[in-house]
């Protein structure tokens, strides 16, 4: 009840109003707007309220700190300090960077933020009293729709304050039309000043630091002003004769790929292997070879010339995460080439899509023969073939000829006389 009574008796008094200009000189000129922002409906002002807690014994008044920070921010955001104007014969809306500044109002409230429930809905204070609505003398005319930003700082009795914004929707930097986020109390005032002195070594030649530049053949900037060429880079990929595989290796060694990499220190570092699972040991001991030699390995099979299986391990020193299945689909084959089968010979599913052997307890899927396509019926090779087929399909049946009719009549009477003679011979009479 006490808070409601204090909120009902709360009054907001506007102490002063003035124009805050940028603290330094800003560039001028007119900035065009987009075709959407030039519509007359976009000249509305977006309103927002921002509530901040504070202390009653603050050394600096919030309005004074925000005013100084606003003047410093307008130097970088100088279009906000301008005015909206119409230029040209068509009256297109532009931002005139005049550098006049934004409208700033300072006000006080006779209650605390707790009395008005920190401006929660429903509002206990009229929002128009917390939003900036400037009053002009009769001799001056400043239409509000030409202003880009209006700010009002209302300080409450508890030390907290409310910042009210009215921002032009046409010049809003955000899609929703909201003003830029407000910094903390005196945030811009406490920032470090920019460096005024000269930067040491700014006029010297640029220094390019590349890790392992002598091994990669990168040109390095010289201190004498020239460019010192680097050492030529060795060949990236080289084929060597396959040595004899160790006795403990599970398969035979097909070939070796020597890949020079800056981070490959002989086997442990560098890139990984495609298709190798985490924690899988090196069966062939290729990583222990000098120079980071890594082998391509596959198990022995009865048939040669098959595609490389999915568990094939290739060197991936660049870290590209290659897909082993793509190597198989690409047509990489090992061993003697296998001649193609005849077209009439059936091919099974396991020949087209080989799979790794399953576990003993798993059930092997059945292999169905590949269905052959049905042969299409060929049309007669004539220029009027479609018309002939259509006429044959819709042609009515031919009428019965006289010869066919005579044959039918003769056979009918032959069977009738045969039955009559049979009845007369055996003396069969009807009852």
UniProtKB/Swiss-Prot annotation:
EC number: 2.3.1.-
Basic and acidic residues biased stretches: 381-394
Skewed-composition ranges (Gly residues): 264-273
Compositionally biased intervals (Low complexity): 224-234
GO molecular function term, any single one: hydroxycinnamoyltransferase activity
This protein's UniProt keywords: Acyltransferase, Transferase
Segments for region (Disordered): 220-247, 260-313, 331-400
Pfam family, one: Transferase
Superkingdom: Eukaryota
Active site, renumbered: 169 (proton acceptor)
InterPro entries (UniProt xref): CAT-like_dom_sf, Plant_acyltransferase
Bias (Basic residues) ranges: 297-306, 335-380
The protein's role, per its UniProt record: Involved in the incorporation of ferulate into the cell wall. May act as arabinoxylan feruloyl transferase.
Recorded family membership: Belongs to the plant acyltransferase family.
Protein name, entry field: Acyl transferase 8
């Amino acid at each position: 009840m006490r808070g409601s009574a204090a909120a009902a008796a709360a009054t907001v008094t506007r102490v002063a109003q003035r124009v805050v200009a940028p603290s330094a000189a800003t560039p001028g000129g007119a900035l065009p707007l987009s075709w959407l922002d030039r519509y007359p409906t976009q000249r509305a002002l977006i309103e927002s309220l921002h509530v901040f807690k504070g202390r009653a014994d603050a050394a600096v008044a919030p309005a004074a700190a925000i005013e100084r920070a606003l003047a410093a921010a307008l130097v970088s955001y100088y279009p906000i300090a301008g005015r909206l104007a119409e230029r040209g014969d068509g009256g297109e809306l532009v931002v005139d960077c005049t550098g006049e500044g934004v409208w700033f109002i300072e006000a006080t409230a006779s209650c605390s933020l707790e009395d008005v429930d920190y401006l929660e809905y429903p509002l206990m204070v009229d929002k128009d009293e917390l939003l900036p609505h400037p009053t002009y003398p009769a001799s001056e005319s400043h239409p509000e729709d030409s202003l880009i930003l209006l700010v009002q700082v209302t300080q409450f009795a508890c030390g907290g304050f409310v910042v009210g914004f009215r921002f032009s929707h046409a010049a809003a930097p955000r899609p929703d039309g909201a003003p830029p986020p407000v910094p903390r109390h005196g945030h811009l005032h406490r920032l470090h000043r920019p460096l005024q002195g000269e930067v040491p070594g700014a006029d010297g030649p640029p220094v390019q630091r590349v890790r392992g530049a002598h091994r990669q053949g990168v040109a390095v900037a010289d201190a004498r002003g020239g460019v010192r060429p680097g050492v030529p880079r060795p060949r990236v990929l080289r084929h060597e004769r396959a040595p004899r595989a160790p006795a403990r290796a599970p398969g035979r060694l097909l070939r070796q790929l020597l890949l020079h990499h800056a981070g490959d220190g002989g086997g442990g570092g560098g890139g990984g292997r495609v298709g190798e699972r985490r924690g899988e040991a090196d069966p062939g001991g290729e990583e222990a070879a000098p120079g980071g030699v890594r082998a391509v390995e596959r198990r022995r099979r009865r048939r040669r010339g098959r595609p490389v299986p999915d568990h094939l391990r290739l060197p991936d020193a660049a870290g590209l995460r290659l897909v082993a299945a793509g190597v198989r689909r690409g047509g990489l084959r090992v061993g003697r080439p296998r001649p193609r089968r005849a077209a009439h010979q059936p091919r099974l599913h396991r020949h087209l899509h080989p799979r790794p052997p399953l576990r003993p307890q798993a059930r092997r899927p059945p292999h169905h023969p590949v269905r052959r396509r049905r042969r299409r019926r060929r049309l007669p090779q004539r220029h009027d073939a479609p018309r002939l087929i259509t006429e044959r399909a819709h042609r009515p049946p031919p009428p019965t000829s006289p010869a066919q009719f005579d044959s039918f009549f003769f056979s009918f009477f032959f069977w009738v006389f045969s039955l009559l003679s049979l009845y007369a011979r055996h003396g069969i009479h009807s009852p």
